[in-house]
Amino acid sequence: MKKMTLICLASLATLSACGGSSKKGAGEEPLPKVYFTSEISPESLVRIYEALGVEAKGRVAVKISTGEAGNTHYLKPEFIGDLVDKLGGTIVECNTAYMGKRNTTEDHWQTIRDHGFVPRFKVDLMDEEGSMDIPVQDTTHIKFDRVGTHLANYDFMVNLAHFKGHAMGGFGGVLKNASIGVASSAGKAYIHSWGNTFGMMELWDYVYNQDAFLESMAAAAQGVHDYFKAKNGIVYINVMNNMSVDCDCDGHPAAPELLDMGIMASLDPVAVDQACLDMVFNHQATEGDDEAALIERITSRHGTHTVDHAAAIGLGSKEYELVNIDL
């Protein structure tokens, strides 16, 4: 397939458009590639994974959000099925740290069944038997990342995220899916409270420091990235459909005002989240296809700070080379 490559010098401050040359100065590392397709289908999901050129070896975890009861925006079994089958993967999730139908193991398994993931796939609720701690490089707020004990059962992770808004983080993509998503219920509270509590009810005492929460997400995402880099590896995919201002953890999300855009994939989690943000922020609104509500949600929560901090601590690059696999 013929591919067109573009350099995207990613800067939300200037909302710069993609363009330029893929060459860097002598001695500089090449920019990470972010692959893009405008087609959202089971076939294109497999194709964009294959474009990454990485073989999933060993026991493969496919990290998705199973979606809160009542939510219809989560990535559906029929969409992800071909990729999961190709990988021989197991869908992995953890319990939540808020009231709903996924904060207990019993209720979460029922939601998993109701949303069609069982019996279609092997599914592992990674913290149903407890938590374990993995190290983080950035200990400014959190001192470790508390994840489900079953994470140790996997050698390779496909971080398959639904890109959309989020009531607390501003937006959710692969960084959130790696941090809050992989954290156990106690670990979620620990990240939300920027290292102050493991309690689901107590975490709300600490929501006043938004940047500390966002920085804790970046640190936890780096912990998960490092964990799998030391094993067989990790890849990152963002699906840009049903882009409500609300997350899949919301049982009654707002209707999307922005039309579906496509799928992005990369080996660099910072680059792929930044590429999605750039696409949203550079979108030109038309009737029935308006980015304003999603941008307001992101900016009102300072959501881009998660990406900024992730880049600052060395998790990845906000500059990237965009590769359109449709061309």
What name fits each language-model region?
Residues 19-26:
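Bacterial lipoprotein signal-peptidase II cleavage site
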Residues 15-17:
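C-terminal motif of bacterial Sec signal peptides marking the signal peptidase cleavage site
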